[in-house]
Amino acid sequence: MASFETASDRLLNKQICMRCNARNPQRAQQCRKCGYGNLRPKAKETRSA
């Protein structure tokens, strides 16, 4: 995906809120927008159909 290691870290090391799909920092415990506690790590690979 990204050309450089630091670029891919910036793009992929995120948490995604399961309720509102907001991007949050990796260390987040709850969503910054809606306060929901169920966060998932952002997918590192694209999904195939």
Curated annotation (Swiss-Prot):
GO biological process terms on file: translation
Superkingdom, natural source: Archaea
GO molecular function: structural constituent of ribosome
GO cellular component term of the entry, any: ribosome
Annotated InterPro entries: Ribosomal_eL40_arc, Ribosomal_eL40_dom, Ribosomal_eL40_sf, Ribosomal_zn-bd
Keyword vocabulary terms for this entry: Ribonucleoprotein, Ribosomal protein
Family annotation (SMART domains): Ribosomal_L40e
Matches recorded under Pfam families: Ribosomal_L40e
Gene3D superfamilies reported in the protein's UniProt record: 4.10.1060.50
Similarity annotation: Belongs to the eukaryotic ribosomal protein eL40 family.
Name this protein carries in UniProt: Large ribosomal subunit protein eL40
Upper classification of the organism: Archaea, Methanobacteriati, Methanobacteriota, Stenosarchaea group, Halobacteria
Gene this protein is translated from: rpl40e
